[in-house]
C-alpha cells in the first residue's frame, strides 16, 4: 500500500472524523439543486407506473376490458383438472431447471445469473443509472477510483511464502507417502519466475555455468533441472546457484540440504566479493552484483531455516539478525517473519515484542504473522485467568479488552486463520506462494504457529470465545472495512490457483444466496405442490381455481 493509504487506514482505526474512507463515496453535503435532481431521478419510475395505470383506466371502455376478462374467465372455467395438472407440472419442471442452473452458476461464479443479466443488460435499456450525483469524469471521482484500483492490485498481489518448505526434503516426501501433489502448476510457475528474477542477470552469457543454470530455472521437468545443475558444476565447481537447485530439489533430508547450502555459501561468498570489486565498472557489473547479492541472501536464509528445523534455533536467530542488519533494503523478503517464528519457539516474548514494534508499523504491509503474533502476545497476559462466566458477570478487564481487540483486528485482516488454529479445518502443506488475507496465508501461518498458540495456556480458549465476535460487534467488517480496507474479492480465485484441488478453499465473506435462487426454489416447490394437489383432489382444486378467477374478475371490474 502507499504511505497515504496507510495514514488513511490509521485515521479510520482511531475514529478520525476527517479520515478519507475509500469506496464509501463520502463527500460534502449536497445542495438543493442536487437533491431535487436526485429526487426527480428516483421518482421517474413511479410516475411512469402511475401514468400507465391511468391510461389503462381511461381506455377500459374502448378496449372492452370487461368483456375480454369475462371471455377469459369462461375459458378458464371450461378447462379440466388434467389441464391444470399438466400446466403446473410443466411450470414445476421449468422452474426446477432454472433453479438448478442458478445454483450451478452461483457456485461457479459467485453471483446470480439472472441478477447479473438484469443489472448489465436490462437496467440500461430501462433507463436505470447508478445512484451517484458526481460526474464520472470529475477529478474527485477519478482520483478515488484510481486509489481503489491501485489498492485492489496491491491486495491481490501474490507473495512468496517466507517460510516455504523444501521441495525435495519435504514436499516430495509428502507425495511419496500420500500420493498427492501438494503444489499446483501455478504455484510452481511463480517459483520459476522468482528463480529467474533472483538468480539470473543479463551477464550470464559471460559464464557458461550461468548460461546452463539460466536454462535450468526455465525447465519444467525436475529431473531435467537436476541434470542441468550437475552440468553447470562440471563447467564450474563454484556455481552457487547449481548447489542451491540441488539442495532445494534433490536433497531428500534437511541434513543433506544443509550440506549443499553450505557448499553454495562458500561459492556464493567468493563470487559476491568479486562482484563488489567490479561493481562500478559498468551497469552490467552492477546488475551482476545485485544478482550475486540475491543469491547470497537466499542461501543464508535457507541455512537459517535448516538450522531452525534441526533444532539449532539460536543459530538460526543469529543468522537472521545478521541478514537484516547487513542487507536492510531486502525487507520485501520478509525475513522478520522467519525471525518471529524462531523467537516464539525460544519463548523470547520480549524480543518478539521488539520485532513487532519495528514491523507492525502503519507504513509497512501487514500480514497474518504480524497481526496474529501481536494478538498472541496480548492474549498471553490474560489467557491463563480468562473465564467466559467471569467475563459475563463482571465484564472484561482493560488487559482482556486489549487482547480481544487484538484478536478482532487479526480476524478482520485474515478471517480464515482461527478455524485452522482451533483445528476446525485440517491443515495441509503450505504453498510456496501466498495471498495476503487469503486462505493460503492462513494455512502458511497456522502450519508453523499452531504450536506456539498451544504452548500458551488458555490462548486458544480465549480465541475460540472471541473470534466470531468480530462479525457480531462490527457490522460487515470485511465488506465495509473497519481497521483495514474492505476484504478483497479476488482472494477466492487466487487461492484456488495456489492450493491443491483436494483442499476445500475457505471463503470469506460468506456469500448469501441470491434472491432469484430463493425465488426459483419457491416457485418450483409451489407449482409441484399444486400439481400434486390437483392430481389427488381435482374437484377441490377446480373449485379453488374458479374462486381465484372470480376474485380476479371482481377486482378488474372494480377498477
UniProtKB/Swiss-Prot annotation:
PANTHER family: SUPPRESSION OF TUMORIGENICITY 7, SUPPRESSOR OF TUMORIGENICITY 7 PROTEIN-LIKE. This is Suppressor of tumorigenicity 7 protein-like. The gene is St7l. It comes from Rattus norvegicus (Rat). It comes from the Eukaryota. The keyword Transmembrane applies. It is found in: Membrane. The keyword Transmembrane helix applies. Keywords: Membrane, Transmembrane, Transmembrane helix. One of its GO terms (biological process) is negative regulation of cell growth. Belongs to the ST7 family.
Amino acid at each position: 500500500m502507499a504511505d497515504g493509504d496507510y495514514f488513511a487506514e490509521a485515521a479510520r482505526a482511531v475514529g478520525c472524523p476527517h479520515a478519507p474512507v475509500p469506496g464509501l463515496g463520502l463527500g460534502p453535503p449536497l445542495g438543493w439543486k442536487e437533491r431535487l435532481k436526485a429526487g426527480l431521478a428516483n421518482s421517474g419510475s413511479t410516475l411512469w407506473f402511475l401514468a400507465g395505470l391511468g391510461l389503462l383506466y381511461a381506455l377500459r371502455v374502448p378496449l372492452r376490458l370487461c368483456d375480454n376478462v369475462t371471455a377469459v374467465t369462461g375459458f378458464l372455467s371450461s378447462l379440466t383438472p388434467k389441464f391444470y395438472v399438466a400446466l403446473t407440472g410443466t411450470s414445476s419442471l421449468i422452474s426446477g431447471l432454472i433453479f438448478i442452473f442458478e445454483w450451478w452458476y452461483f457456485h461457479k461464479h459467485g453471483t446470480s445469473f439472472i441478477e447479473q443479466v438484469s443489472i448489465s443488460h436490462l437496467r440500461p435499456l430501462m433507463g436505470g443509472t447508478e445512484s451517484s450525483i458526481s460526474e464520472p469524469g470529475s477529478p474527485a471521482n477519478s482520483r478515488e477510483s484510481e486509489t481503489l484500483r491501485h489498492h485492489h492490485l496491491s491486495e491481490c498481489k501474490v507473495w512468496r511464502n517466507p517460510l516455504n518448505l523444501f521441495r525435495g526434503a519435504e514436499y516430495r516426501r509428502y507425495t511419496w507417502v500420500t500420493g498427492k501433489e501438494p503444489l499446483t502448476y501455478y504455484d510452481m510457475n511463480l517459483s520459476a519466475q522468482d528463480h529467474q528474477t533472483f538468480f539470473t542477470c543479463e551477464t550470464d552469457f559471460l559464464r557458461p555455468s550461468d548460461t546452463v543454470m539460466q536454462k535450468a530455472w526455465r525447465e519444467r521437468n525436475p529431473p531435467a533441472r537436476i541434470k542441468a545443475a550437475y552440468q553447470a558444476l562440471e563447467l564450474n565447481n563454484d556455481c552457487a546457484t547449481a548447489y542451491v537447485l540441488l539442495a532445494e530439489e534433490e536433497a531428500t533430508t534437511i541434513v543433506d540440504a544443509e550440506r549443499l547450502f553450505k557448499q553454495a555459501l562458500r561459492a556464493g561468498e567468493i563470487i559476491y566479493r568479486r562482484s563488489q570489486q567490479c561493481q562500478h565498472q559498468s551497469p552490467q557489473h552492477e546488475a551482476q552484483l545485485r544478482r550475486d547479492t540475491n543469491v547470497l541472501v537466499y542461501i543464508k536464509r535457507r541455512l537459517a531455516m535448516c538450522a531452525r528445523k534441526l533444532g539449532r534455533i539460536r543459530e538460526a536467530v543469529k543468522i537472521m539478525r545478521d541478514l537484516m542488519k547487513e542487507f536492510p533494503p531486502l525487507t520485501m523478503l520478509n525475513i522478520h517473519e522467519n525471525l518471529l517464528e524462531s523467537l516464539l519457539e525460544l519463548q523470547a516474548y520480549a524480543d518478539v515484542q521488539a520485532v513487532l514494534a519495528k514491523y507492525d508499523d502503519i507504513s509497512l504491509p501487514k500480514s497474518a504473522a504480524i497481526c496474529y503474533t501481536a494478538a498472541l502476545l496480548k492474549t498471553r497476559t490474560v489467557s491463563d485467568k480468562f473465564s467466559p462466566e467471569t467475563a459475563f458477570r463482571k465484564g472484561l478487564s482493560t488487559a482482556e479488552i486489549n487482547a480481544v481487540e487484538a484478536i478482532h483486528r487479526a480476524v478482520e485482516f485474515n478471517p480464515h486463520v482461527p478455524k485452522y488454529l482451533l483445528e476446525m479445518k485440517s491443515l495441509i502443506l503450505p504453498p510456496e506462494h501466498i495471498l495476503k488475507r487469503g486462505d493460503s496465508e492462513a494455512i502458511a501461518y497456522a502450519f508453523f504457529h499452531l504450536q506456539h498458540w498451544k504452548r500458551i495456556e488458555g490462548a486458544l480458549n480465549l480465541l475460540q470465545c472471541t473470534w466470531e465476535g468480530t462479525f457480531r460487534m462490527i457490522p460487515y467488517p470485511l465488506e465495509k472495512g473497519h481497521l483495514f480496507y474492505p476484504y478483497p474479492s479476488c482472494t477466492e480465485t487466487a487461492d484456488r490457483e495456489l492450493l491443491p484441488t483436494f483442499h476445500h478453499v475457505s471463503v470469506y465473506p460468506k456469500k448469501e444466496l441470491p434472491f432469484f435462487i430463493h425465488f426459483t426454489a419457491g416457485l418450483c416447490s409451489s407449482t409441484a405442490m399444486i400439481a400434486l394437489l390437483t392430481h389427488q383432489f381435482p374437484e377441490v382444486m377446480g373449485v379453488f381455481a374458479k374462486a381465484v378467477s372470480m376474485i380476479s374478475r371482481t377486482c378488474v371490474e372494480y377498477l
